[in-house]
Amino acid sequence: MLPAEWEPQRFVQLTWPHADTDWAPYLDAAQECFLNIARAITLHEPLLVVTPTPEDVEAQLREGGVDMSQVVIEECPTNDTWARDHAFICTREPDKIGGSTDDYVEGGGNIILHDFTFNGWGMKFAANLDNQINRTIYDDDTFADNDILDIWDATYQDNRDKILEGGSIESDGKGTILTPTECLLSANRNIFEGKSSFKRWFFDDFGAQRVLWLDDGFLLGDDTDSHIDTLARFCPNDTIVYVKCEDPDDIHYDALKQMEEQLKGFSTVDGKPFRLLALPLPAPIHESDFPDAVASEGDQRLPATYANFLVINGAVLYPTYNQPDNDQRAAEVLHDAFPDREIIGIDCRVLIRQHGSLHCVTMQYPK
């Protein structure tokens, strides 16, 4: 079964930005954002950092005040930083299935590490190095020989005959997957015969009993073909938080309104409507808003979204965009969805300059 993100976790993975990536024009700001994420994670659970320059990254982490007793660094060549989409997707064997901490069974079934192919969101960008990270980590026995990560009992499963990105699927931990039609049915990813093929695939690999297809919703500047983690997210107690646009003149208004109506029509496995909580859509942010704007990027609108939050043990990390009212409203919605967790905001304006945000650069590994 594919666990819900709020179930107990072993650690989180970050793939660190470096000078040979598209982050180069504003690398210091990107690395500072990653340091803020790393500090927040290591207050609650261990952290795996993947980088081609381990000595430099270790120095950054130490100087940044990160608890190094919680950190494992893996040396590996990388194209970019989007761990959500190139990292392992983990399932749990049946005797550890559960939708909450209370359902977790200590000492139950093992974790299965699914290694899918990542092809740069439908061959838009180079991904040859990122696509080898999982195999390198596993072959180096990084998981097997490390007490910090504590995932020695995980089983590797080669799924590289299929293309799948972690940001394209949401699980409620009870057998339901929420996913965007546009992304999964993209011709540049998999050659499948429609939704029924995916339903069989998700049942075989993830134990999914149901797939809810989201047909509407998008963000300008998004390279992923509308990843679900930018639009709508499962939360505990049959809740979905989603992005809502309140400005009829905004280009997103109609599509997000249609998405909202579709979400209202979805039902839980028990046949009841989901509890829906609306996140605000951030005010428009453009590349030209930054003093060091890259001329080649033009004046494009960037895909800022509060739906791109990360749930970790005891906390929710969510992106902020220097918009005090919207940032605060988003925090209040997330507190409503996760009342027992600390809600921690992290300025992610630099991340959207490369068309992702906080959830996109992280991947959690469940217990």
Named regions from a protein language model:
Residues 1-367:
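The feature marks the mature, well-folded catalytic cores of soluble enzymes
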